[in-house]
């Protein structure tokens, strides 16, 4: 599987540790055939190595290597490394996107990104994934928060006008129903609000579908 171009940042606070999944995908790829790509899930851990024996993996890392594949189908451990003073456990998880991905039944697909018939850019999470996230949260010692961010990249070769973001954070600034344009080769980061995030991460009586933004009508 290859990396995809609409950046998806899915983050957790796992037992108080910051976690993020990052993948980039240009707008042009939303019109491609349905396909699976990989997102990078990075989780902050107390340390990669055991304090007693640096040749051994830490208990926190061992625990994550067991639990993350139980939450995300197809998740694979990649590496554990240090960034300045922080230790990060990195995984890859599959995400599916494409021009017909939302209405197509794909075996094993838990996370999807695509456009509906009204050109709304949506992200969906299956009931099975939401159940696993909620169960994982209940098993965690401290609060388990989930946030989702998207880096939209305009690689269409022209300015894209009249995109609409509803009640979201744009480049980390809170906004409500903002209409904006994207110059050629520009990018913008959108983070879902709490309500949309809960739709993707809690069982509830919802369909697991959240709006990212409204694209201009063709």
Residue ranges and their predicted role:
Residues 2-8:
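Sec-dependent signal peptide recognition
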Residues 20-22, 26-87:
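N-terminal Sec/ER secretory leader and immediately downstream segment
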Residues 69-218:
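Mature, soluble, non-transmembrane domains
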Residues 15-16:
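C-terminal motif of bacterial Sec signal peptides marking the signal peptidase cleavage site
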């Amino acid at each position: 599987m290859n990396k995809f171009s609409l950046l998806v940042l899915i983050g957790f606070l796992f037992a108080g540790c910051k976690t993020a999944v990052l993948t980039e995908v240009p707008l042009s790829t939303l019109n491609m055939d349905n396909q699976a790509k990989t997102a990078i899930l990075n989780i902050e851990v107390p340390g990669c190595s055991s304090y007693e024996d640096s040749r051994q993996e830490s208990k926190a890392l061992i625990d994550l290597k067991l639990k993350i594949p139980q939450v995300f189908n197809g998740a694979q451990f990649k590496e554990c490394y240090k960034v300045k003073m922080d230790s990060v456990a990195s995984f890859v998880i599959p995400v599916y996107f494409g021009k017909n991905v939302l209405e197509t039944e794909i075996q094993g697909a838990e996370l999807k990104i695509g456009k509906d018939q009204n050109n709304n850019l949506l992200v969906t999470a299956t009931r099975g994934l939401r159940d696993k996230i909620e169960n994982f949260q209940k098993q965690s010692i401290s609060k388990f928060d989930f946030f989702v961010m998207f880096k939209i990249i305009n690689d269409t070769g022209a300015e894209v006008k009249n995109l609409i973001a509803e009640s979201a954070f744009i480049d980390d600034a809170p906004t409500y129903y903002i209409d904006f344009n994207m110059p050629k080769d520009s990018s913008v980061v959108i983070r879902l609000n709490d309500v949309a995030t809960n739709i993707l991460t809690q069982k509830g009586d919802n369909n697991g579908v959240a709006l990212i933004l409204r694209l201009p009508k063709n």
